[in-house]
Amino acid sequence: LPEDLGKFDAIVGRRVLMYLPDPQRALQLLIQHLKPNGIIAFQESDAIKCGVGGDRLPHHQEAIQRVWKTVQAEGGDIHIGQKLYDIFLRLGIESPHIEAEAVMQTAENNDLQWLTEIMIERMRAHHIVDDDFTLDQFKQEMTEEAEENKAAFIRDMNFGIWGHGLFL
């Protein structure tokens, strides 16, 4: 980062650390640009417990796994949320505040068809789905499964963390 970037009251990010090769180093560079008593806050998704509650929804379960396998194939850390507290501590941020929230969805109200549709080319590029995989068939199977099985499930977890940076 340029040294003349300045100082900020807060630095926030969402779903970015999971895609960085060295998130701790990135945060280390960022906190140098915090004002005294500045806040650094991040929210990251995590695949922990994904699919819990959806035992009667095998197509939904497969869709969740395809999304996470694609992110992982692209170099994303699908468990970064669980690591945030330790990373903040290693940066010298004392007593960071951390929360986790389950992203609950239902068979009839979820974003898995949309996610699959926008990620389909990425899924194909990483061989997560075969060339014969069709969105129309997938959507039909998901819709039929939702009509037959009313269930709620955890799609993923959101981890949020914030703390005050150290200033030397």
Whereabouts are the PLM-identified features?
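A short acidic, Gly/Pro-enriched loop at the edge of an enzyme's catalytic core
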Residues: L1-I11
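Residues lining the SAM
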Residues: G13-L17, Q43
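Short conserved AdoMet
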Residues: P21, K35, I93
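A short glycine-rich, Lys/Arg-flanked "PGG" loop and its adjoining helix->strand segment in the class I
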Residues: Q24-I39
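Conserved catalytic/acceptor-binding region of the Class I
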Residues: A41-N110, A125-I128
